[in-house]
Amino acid sequence: MKDTKEIKRSPPHLLKKFAVCDIPLYDICDYNVTRERCRSLDCCFYRGVCYEKAVPIYVQVFFTLIWFVAGAFIIAVIYRVIQGTKKEKKPLLPEDSQVEILKSPTPELIPEPIPEPIPEPIPEPIREPPPPVKKTESPIEAGCCLWMKSKPAKDQPQKETAAPEPPSNPEVKKVNSGSAVPQAAP
C-alpha cells in the first residue's frame, strides 16, 4: 500500500454552519476552544484557532469618510429646503390691495437729474507772433538765427539792418562805423 496523505474536508452541512475566516481581517479571539464555544463567543473558527471578527483601520477610515460625506450631503439638502421655504414665505400683498393699485394708479414723481455746470475753457497763453521777414534778409537768416542777432560774436562786427536809432544824448553822436565820438559842449 501506498502511503498518501488525505486531505480532510468538512462535510458540506458543517461548512454552512461554521464560516471560514479570512485571517488578515480578524484578530485572535481564543485558543483551544471548540467550534461551538467559538460560535457562542460570536467568533469564527479556523484551523483550531478561534478568530474575532475585526475590521482593519483603513476599512474603518473609509466607512467614516462615507458617513461624513453622507451627513454633509443631508445637511446641505435640509439647508436648501429651509431656505426655499423662507423665500416662499415672503409677505405678499393681498389680492384686494393689488386690485386697488391697478384701479387707481398714483403717478410717482421721478426727480430729474440736475445738469452739471459746464466748465469754462481755460484760456491758452498768448503767443507772440514771429518777427516779420525783411525783404533784405532771407527767411533762413530771419527765422533760424535770431539768437545770433541778439548776441553778436566778438570777432564779427554787428550788421545794422534797421535804421539807426537817434541818440538819446544830444551831445553824443553815433557814427556809422559803430564807434561813438564824444563832442565838446558849445
Swiss-Prot record:
GO CC list: membrane
Main location: membrane
Membrane-side (Cytoplasmic) residue stretches: 78-151
Positions on the Extracellular side per record topology: 1-56
Transmembrane segments: 57-77
Location(s) in or outside the cell: Membrane
Keywords from the named record: Membrane, Transmembrane, Transmembrane helix
Pro residues bias spans: 108-133
InterPro entries, alphabetized: TEX29
Superkingdom classification of source: Eukaryota
Keyword NADP carried by entry: no
Mode of membrane association: Single-pass membrane protein
Span list, region Disordered: 104-138, 151-186
Protein name per the record: Testis-expressed protein 29
